[in-house]
Amino acid sequence: MFSRRTFLSLVAGSIAAPEFASAQPSSQKVALYANVGADLTHYDVDVAGAELTKRETVALPAAVQYAWPHASRRYLYVASSSSAPGYGTAGTEHHVTAIRIDPETGALTPHGAPIRLPTRPIHISTDIPSEYILVAFNNPSSVRVYRVNKDFTPGEEVSQPGSIDAGIFAHQVRVTPDNRLAILVTRGNEGTPTKEEDPGALKVFNYKNGVLTNEVSIAPNGGKEFGPRHLDFHPTKPWMYVSIETQNKMYMFRMEPSRINPEIAYRAETLAEPNNIRARQAAGTVHVHPNGRFVYGQIAPRPPSSFRASRSSRAVKTASSCTRLTNRPASRHRSSTPRPRRSTRAPFTSTRAGTCWSRSTIYR
């Protein structure tokens, strides 16, 4: 059984960065990159035939945690760590590695030397022009920024002018499409019978040339019952979608010039029966389709793990038309994609269409 961090997939880049999978001629080659532990493997994707063909494998210094493509789509930046997930046993090997993508074949080759990180990275991304790499760490919660060298290798850390409040349990860091704000998603922790809830927040910074300043915290209700995990942006509208892990919600915030409006514009349930939770369920990754018409969210870890696809339009964004893909066989890991095999019949192997969750609607 693979854990969420042991197995991670980038399906033609569309999961890690939606803009990576913009509309392309059907004749263009499509590549899939997936990892098990420290091994990152390239697969050719036959879209018409729904087949995968295994190609080369690149070994990272430790288990892959996350990966993000350079804006040129010629390189991947891969965060790896030997630490256990969450607050588990701490390891000693934490890195960012650059990997070159052959523009003709999609083949992967290591590019330069990895850089060391202080602790386990939970998420990695770049700013819009990929001049800087942003890394989120969960234990302790923090965010750091590293330069991208002229040869596209990861470089030195950028010194920040002041202290940063990184909240509790950072889960993701992203730069807004205009490259003017950086957002650190901090989930907090659920309360227990013996411990009070740790509040969650969206930590919003002014961003310029790798420097984070003027931090503002968005924390409805003081961060209580607000456990954000992951966010994504609409490709053409000033809308930001945030999955709220601990409350199983999907929120939408409006982006304004130089700020995120702190008011929750719209919200939706991610569960069909939010008042009848039979096992711990948690809203996970969220991604907006490149055409802006669909928002995809993951619910985990109740077996089997599931996807939810919410349909949106310019005027009304509704989840009434959706598809659920269910991993098979059931497992308790949070991985979004089962392990591919050579010539498997579909980019997502061992999946089946299931019935849609009950209707929920988000209005513009």
PLM regions: where:
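Loop/turn-rich, solvent-exposed surfaces of beta-rich toroidal or solenoidal domains
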Residues: V288-T326, P338-P347, R359
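A short beta-strand motif characteristic of beta-propeller blades
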Residues: T53-V58, P110-P114, V158-S163, N214-N221, ...
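Asp-box/WD-like beta-propeller blade repeats and closely related beta-sheet repeat scaffolds
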Residues: T109-R174
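Short, solvent-exposed loop/turn segments at conserved positions within beta-propeller repeat blades
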Residues: N35-V36, G86-E93, N138-S141, T192-G200, ...
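Short loop/turn segments immediately following beta-strands, especially the blade-tip
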Residues: D44-G49, R100-G106, R147-P154, N206-V211, ...
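Beta-rich, blade/repeat-based domains predominating
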Residues: P61-S72, L117-P129, S163-L181, G222-W239, ...
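N-terminal secretory signal peptides and thylakoid transit peptides that target proteins
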Residues: M1-I15
